[in-house]
Amino acid sequence: MEDKSKEQEKLYSYLISTFQSSALIALGIMKNPMSKEISQNLDQASYYIKLLEMLEHKTKGNVTEYEKQILLNTLSDLKMKFIEQKSKKVRGKS
């Protein structure tokens, strides 16, 4: 049973990191692995953040403390980066 629990923990972490990578690409922080280019789409980044928020809501009370912290830390980091990128974009328009 412990092996299944560890496997699920790894899969949960992988799911979070997949959304995190997609958000970082949309924020223009990471290169798109397909195009090898950096481009920014804040609407798309917001979508990935909302997916992670939904995951937090739907899994509340059903994850380990470790899994909870991974998700909360990822969300916090992405939200800060989103605010930074959005403010850069606003300053660039002024």
Task: Mark where each language-model region is.
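N-terminal intrinsically disordered, cationic/polar leader segments
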Residues: 1-50, 54, 65-94
